[in-house]
């Protein structure tokens, strides 16, 4: 199974494509799509959309896994992240790829085994599970890979129970 994990952000959108086969993870590609704060928001969203569309076309994931919104006191931030999630989901759906959403708690639980794990613990497990030399930077990239790993673990468990996604 090939999964594209996305950590949505307007300035930095983290992405990571992971192959999961025979209970082993292989990182295919990972990185960040960045936009400049001085540019019109509509163009920034378009840049992120086109970047994701290109990644999906090139690496052909079967699934897109994206982090769900979490509560933030800054309503402007929540709205902007919601817009980025919207274009991310649209890029996947327009490419015929199924989308799954996971809360930060679900991601931590799946990757570390503890839903209240610290960010550093999650990043370290991403490094270990993907057999990487170092923790991917920026943090958004490690977070995106964690979301992809979360889907693989969740799907694997459901398949064992006979409820494969």
UniProtKB/Swiss-Prot annotation:
Family in the record: Belongs to the RuvC family.
SUPFAM superfamilies: Ribonuclease H-like
Organism lineage: Bacteria, Bacillati, Bacillota, Clostridia, Thermoanaerobacterales
Name of the protein in its database record: Crossover junction endodeoxyribonuclease RuvC
Subcellular location(s) of the protein: Cytoplasm
Cofactor comment text: Binds 2 Mg(2+) ion per subunit.
Stretch forming the signal peptide: none
Residues holding Mg(2+) 2: 67
Annotated EC: 3.1.21.10
Record keywords, A-Z: Cytoplasm, DNA damage, DNA recombination, DNA repair, DNA-binding, Endonuclease, Hydrolase, Magnesium, Metal-binding, Nuclease
Assembly description: Homodimer which binds Holliday junction (HJ) DNA. The HJ becomes 2-fold symmetrical on binding to RuvC with unstacked arms; it has a different conformation from HJ DNA in complex with RuvA. In the full resolvosome a probable DNA-RuvA(4)-RuvB(12)-RuvC(2) complex forms which resolves the HJ.
Main location: cytoplasm
One GO CC annotation: cytoplasm
GO biological process: DNA recombination; DNA repair
Top EC class, one word: hydrolase
Active site residues of this protein: 7, 67, 140
Intrachain disulfide bonds: none
Protein species of origin: Caldanaerobacter subterraneus subsp. tengcongensis (strain DSM 15242 / JCM 11007 / NBRC 100824 / MB4)
Function: The RuvA-RuvB-RuvC complex processes Holliday junction (HJ) DNA during genetic recombination and DNA repair. Endonuclease that resolves HJ intermediates. Cleaves cruciform DNA by making single-stranded nicks across the HJ at symmetrical positions within the homologous arms, yielding a 5'-phosphate and a 3'-hydroxyl group; requires a central core of homology in the junction. The consensus cleavage sequence is 5'-(A/T)TT(C/G)-3'. Cleavage occurs on the 3'-side of the TT dinucleotide at the point of strand exchange.
Required cofactor(s): Mg(2+)
One Pfam family of this chain: RuvC
Reaction equations catalysed: Endonucleolytic cleavage at a junction such as a reciprocal single-stranded crossover between two homologous DNA duplexes (Holliday junction)
Amino-acid positions noted as binding Mg(2+) 1 in the UniProt annotation, renumbered to this chain: 7, 140
